[in-house]
Amino acid sequence: MAYEYSESKYLPSGLERVENPAMYEVGGLHPVNLGQSYQEGRYKIAHKLGNGGFSTTWLARDSRNNTYVALKFVTSAASEGYGDLKTLRDISSGSDAQAGYEYINHLLDEFYVDGPNGHHLCLVSKALGASVANISSDLHRLSGKASQEVASQAVSALGYLHSLGICHGDFTSANVLFQLLGTLDTLNVDELYAVLGNPVKESVRTRDGSAVGLSAPSYVVESIDFAAVPTLLSLRLKVIDFDQAFQISTPPSKMLGTPPRCLSPEAIFDHEVGVASDVWALGCLIFRIRSGYELFGNFGGPSPYYALMQIVKTLGKLPKKWRNRRFDDHGYPAEDSNDDAEVLVCEPLQAPLVDAVLEIERSPIGSSVSDRDNLEAMVWTPSAEYGSVNGEESTAYISKEEADCLFDLLSKIFRFRPEERLGLQEIADHPWFKLQI
């Protein structure tokens, strides 16, 4: 759950990829500055990697191993009794001989730091690059071959978690990241900045013009945009963010904090989650990897109501037990006794799955090469010209053979009944992963 902050004394930042300064208060974020060191000088902050609902993540130099690592500083409120720490330890306790182990971003170290806003947990893991959401988007796409490779790794990663009796719970394109090439570790900080650019900073300011104080840093730092430097990225992925993870034997009884576009219908309506709901999210991820957009997230707003509208438009009518369920003003399922709640109204199959698959664009011929360690060579831009028909640019779609094969895979994943969905081994063995595209 995201940290709930009070009305902020700080002005919002004008930068895009930064945390909300309002989160710098007691119970909130720990103020981190470039050049600071932690754990008796072992980890030195070099750049910013990202921020989330209750954390900031920084690129740091590990002087002991001469590598760059990620330091995730959790809000002090979330650090207290941090329930995900056991899950992270369990995930990292497996053997690297197990299939899928290599595609999980394992916990390398953990420590606590005291600051003006409280007692903060810091999690150390391998530093990673851009996410699938960044690379497979409106601006960038993966080639067909790269899509198969990345999707196959995602299946293997999820299989590893399930073999430990753990569900990820938030298996989305934002939580699947590409690894950085080893050359990054050979760079000192000045050389790192020469490649990535100097950190973009903006001073933190108060609303009344008073001094910032100790609770906030003197400046916020914009996160690195690794999608802009694909030469640093490998085609190998790692899965991150286990905040929504749970034991298969003891699933949560409330709705997961997963983006609704990736939630299965039973997770939305009945809060029933498990292996099958992870498989549904995997199906959403596979479509995003191949197409560059979310199958159930391009209509309305970011609520379960609109996600379900897209599901109905794509897959057809909901099972009878869900058809008359009502939704509150925020788009979440409401109690049947709430007469003010709204019933889902949508024409089924307005945008069927088969059409969505047929409309996936393929990369221009000759745009990809066989070097599996070079992600840059596997990425293309949708604006690339394919050729001209009657003086107008034409778009090339994936072949009918691939469309039929991919549709077969996805249609067997996106089943309303969880027990009817493909298992992970069946997905891994599906012909689409071996198709020459």
What do the predicted segments below correspond to?
Residues 1-437:
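Intrinsically disordered, low-complexity regulatory segments of kinases
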